[in-house]
Every structure is written in structure tokens, then in C-alpha cells.
Design a protein with these regions (language model features):
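Basic nucleic-acid-binding interfaces
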Residues: 1-116
Length: 116
């Protein structure tokens, strides 16, 4: 869905993937559900659209919509940094993410859209 700011129309979606430190398969059960809630909170706070969350035992897939003012690396920084901080403050077990991540764009632009 096309959204708008004062000066721009946009449809920006990012597929973001990252893993826990040492790729430990620990993102299951209560941890998985807690992280889903935390990612939703972060997206609400930062005016992002959380389209889809898929948490596997050893990695996280997020599909996030964002206004054009936010560069992809900033989104990853928010999602990894804030989620680890919130999780570690609220629960006894600890979450640490690796420094690496994957981010790709997703969306569709037709010839008609370019011509307009």
C-alpha cells in the first residue's frame, strides 16, 4: 500500500535477517513469543509497519515497512539493539545478536508506475 509524508509518496519494505551470537538455536517457545511482542513494540514506537515476523530457532526474519527517512542500517540497529536491551531488562535469560545481518528490498514497480 502506498503511503505518504508531506513531500513524498512511498512504498518501502525491507526483508531483514539476523542471528543470535554463536548461532545458538535458542529462539523457541517463550523466547520466540517474547521477541515477537518486543519487535511489535519497537515498530509501533518507531512508526514502522511490521508486516511479518518469522522466528526460527537460530535466526529471525522480519518484513518491515518504513518511511524513506529511515535508512536500512538504522532499522536493523533499532530492531537488534532495542530488542536485546528490552529482552535482557525484562527476562532472566539473555539475548545477544551478532554484528552481521542481511537486508533486502521488496516491492513492485510496474512500467505504468514509472511513466506516471
Amino acid at each position: 500500500m502506498v503511503k505518504s509524508t508531506r513531500h513524498a509518496k512511498y512504498e518501502l519494505y525491507y526483508h531483514i535477517v539476523f542471528i543470535p551470537k554463536y548461532r545458538e538455536p535458542r529462539l523457541m517457545g517463550a523466547t520466540k513469543e517474547r521477541l515477537k511482542t518486543i519487535f511489535a513494540e519497537i515498530c509501533d514506537d518507531k512508526d514502522l509497519e511490521l508486516v511479518e515476523v518469522e522466528i526460527m530457532p537460530d535466526h529471525v526474519h522480519l518484513f518491515v515497512g518504513s518511511p524513506p527517512r529511515n535508512e536500512p542500517s538504522l532499522l536493523v540497529n533499532w530492531l537488534k539493539g532495542i530488542s536485546a536491551r528490552y529482552y535482557n531488562q525484562r527476562y532472566d535469560d539473555r539475548i545477544k545478536w551478532t554484528r552481521s545481518y542481511y537486508v533486502g528490498t521488496a516491492g513492485s514497480v510496474s512500467k505504468d508506475t514509472v511513466e506516471q
